[in-house]
Amino acid sequence: MIKRVNKLVLGISFLFLIISIFAGCGTGKEAEIKKSFEKTLSMYPIKNLEDLYDKEGYRDDQFDKNDKGTWIVRSSMSIQSNGKDMNIKGMVLYMNRNTRTTNGYYYVDVIEREDKGIHRDNEKRYPVKMVDNKIIPTKEIKDEKIKKEIENFKFFVQYGDFKDLSKYKDGDISYNPEVPSYSAKYQLTNDDYNVKQLRKRYNIPTNKAPKLLLKGTGNLKGSSIGYKKIEFTFVEKKGENIYFSDGLHFNPSEDK
């Protein structure tokens, strides 16, 4: 009887040890993912995007020694309600630190319903440039609504704030060392500062609080190969998807 009890105690102790080890690994990987994102997110908000001309990101052997690098800034909102087509609006800027010039495009995309076949050839791009922190179309736009959307567009990096990234805890952590890829997902509330900022700027057709997804590929310690992006997912199900995507990347320049 005593031997059975001892075996049972030993088995339970071993089980707790295994659980503790896995929990510790998860906590450690979560801290690594946060640290990887903090290098970029700690810069938010950057109200004047031209300040990025004087900021350098992570450099590795992919950069030419004379290349100051290019910042790629992107933000987009995607909305699909009640099985309708998905509408996406966003902007991408390429900020060349060598020439201190910025070009990019505003885009509007419609992804048709599944029963009609999903494809992206409905995307329309409107080329833009940035001068004195103002985004200006480089070609004539007759659609006044689009012109206004470009004029009023703000990137999330200009108003988002992740100074208190450590407050997000107990995330759903995923890590694949083979790719490598990694992610951390957190349930937010509608009282979260960044959620309030998004609702202030976009007509988001749901009262559900979003989940914050920090997702990336490449070396966790830093790499110019791969990507990092953040996503606020309000709704994610068949026929209804509402999410906001943002990214700030530092890459080698195509023209040195």
Curated annotation (Swiss-Prot):
Family: Belongs to the staphylococcal tandem lipoprotein family.
Pfam families: DUF576
Name this protein carries in UniProt: Uncharacterized lipoprotein SA0093
Membrane topology: Lipid-anchor
Annotated lipid attachment (N-palmitoyl cysteine): C25
Broad class of where this protein is predominantly found: membrane
Entry keyword set: Cell membrane, Lipoprotein, Membrane, Palmitate, Signal
Leader sequence residues: 1-24
Organism this protein belongs to: Staphylococcus aureus (strain N315)
Keyword Membrane included in the entry's annotation: yes
Locations listed in the record: Cell membrane
GO CC field: plasma membrane
NCBIfam families: SA_tandem_lipo
Positions of S-diacylglycerol cysteine lipidation: C25
